[in-house]
């Protein structure tokens, strides 16, 4: 069996994810090491990601390690992976999804409805900002950057009445007790790929692709391929208030996509489509169709598809 090196960010959550993949590969007879790295996205905490390079800042250094041979694969939270990978790189594996929902986290309040008028809520995405404003336009929404532990510490320091985080990250780190409530997708549609892990490799490394094949989860891969197709066709990034979530039942893939106004001035736009899918190509085609419908609906609603300027500190 082969010897493999995993490139990973050094946050506690990123290391958990890399060690999870390491364990699965080790059980299959591979020798697996870790290469921890601090990315530019981890270092820049005082400016909007949209102003300094977007979510690609979290993967660029890892891709360099793949390119120069220091690492064989990189493990990512799929929602943080840019919709277009550089030439020579491939998404070789999508693993079974954890909880895709967003979590309401607070030390004082049980859920969003219980927050007092004008309460301060911290969130790190324009998507969450837009959806929160659609649910509770009275709230004061403030930027929130940093890794998971940093965000929780800011909440505990009293900077926010509540914060919104991905449920998957909290559950993976054994922090489910911090979740006061979860938002159902009907209330807060997740980001494309949320809750799933993606593994990136150099596209010519067929040996690594073959080693990763047993870790792939076909149903999740179909769903997130459709979601990422929506986002790709919309020009989605961390600087667009876009949500996309797909579910598969009896070979029928249903995609919900939404566009919101972070300022809360325009109504939320939501579209849904379903179709039978059998492979990644048909899932991607359905995602592109949903994106076309969403684009038309946004423009008809008076919205703009230009990427938004996130407030300073916003991711």
Curated annotation (Swiss-Prot):
Please give the cofactor(s) recorded in the UniProt entry for this protein: dipyrromethane
Q: In which pathway does it act?
A: Porphyrin-containing compound metabolism; protoporphyrin-IX biosynthesis; coproporphyrinogen-III from 5-aminolevulinate: step 2/4
Q: Which residues carry this modification: S-(dipyrrolylmethanemethyl)cysteine?
A: 238
GO terms for CC? cytoplasm
Coiled-coil ranges (or none): none
Do you know which InterPro entries this protein is assigned to?
HemC, Porphobilin_deaminase_N, Porphobilinogen_deaminase_C, Porphobilinogen_deaminase_C_sf
- Gene Ontology molecular function: hydroxymethylbilane synthase activity
Q: How is the cofactor bound?
A: Binds 1 dipyrromethane group covalently.
The record's keywords, sorted A to Z, are:
Porphyrin biosynthesis, Transferase
Q: What is its EC number?
A: 2.5.1.61
Reactions this protein catalyses: 4 porphobilinogen + H2O = hydroxymethylbilane + 4 NH4(+)
| Gene Ontology biological process terms, A to Z | protoporphyrinogen IX biosynthetic process
Q: Which cysteines are joined by disulfide bonds?
A: none
Q: What does this protein do?
A: Tetrapolymerization of the monopyrrole PBG into the hydroxymethylbilane pre-uroporphyrinogen in several discrete steps.
Q: What family does the database annotate?
A: Belongs to the HMBS family.
Q: How does it assemble?
A: Monomer.
Further facts: The porphobilinogen subunits are added to the dipyrromethane group.
Protein name (Swiss-Prot/TrEMBL): Porphobilinogen deaminase
Gene from which this protein is expressed: hemC
